[in-house]
């Protein structure tokens, strides 16, 4: 667990990616992703725990695995991408945070998007969960944004 992690305009990749910080993780303009397709359990993939996450203009993506992000304060995903996809198995994106700013950003899962986020700002953004979207939000600001939940 580091005080702060700075991956701005950088690249972090691996079979499983576990990042833990007592401070802020800065991934603005950076990428955090898996370095190939693996046969993981659907619950495995990228796990980020921190006081805050800055993914503005950044990309957090896992193929054939899930993405879990837990922050105390804010997930900033303005013009950023958070994505978990799989052609087989149940993947998901799990978000726990006080605030989510997804202005102009995209959060996409071929499975579920779930968790607890008190305040969501999704102006011009897209939150798409093909297995459903359930973030238990208290406040939602969604000017020209899209939230798509598709149960096939």
Regions picked out by a protein language model, each given a short descriptive name:
Residues 3-7, 11-13, 17-19, 23-27, ...:
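Extracellular beta-strand scaffolds
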């Amino acid at each position: 667990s580091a005080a702060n992690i700075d991956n701005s305009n950088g690249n972090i990749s691996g079979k499983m990616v576990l990042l833990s910080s007592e401070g802020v993780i800065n991934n603005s303009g950076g990428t955090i992703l898996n370095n190939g397709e693996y046969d993981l359990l659907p619950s495995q993939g990228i796990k980020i725990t921190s006081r805050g996450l800055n993914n503005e203009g950044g990309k957090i993506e896992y193929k054939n695995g899930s993405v879990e992000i837990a922050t105390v304060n804010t997930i900033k995903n303005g013009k950023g991408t958070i994505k978990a996809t799989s052609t087989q198995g149940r993947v998901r994106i799990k978000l726990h945070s006080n605030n989510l700013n997804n202005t102009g950003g995209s959060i996409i899962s071929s499975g579920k998007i779930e968790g607890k986020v008190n305040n969501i700002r999704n102006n011009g953004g897209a939150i798409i969960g093909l297995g459903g979207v359930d973030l238990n939000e208290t406040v939602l600001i969604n000017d020209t944004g899209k939230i798509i939940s598709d149960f096939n």
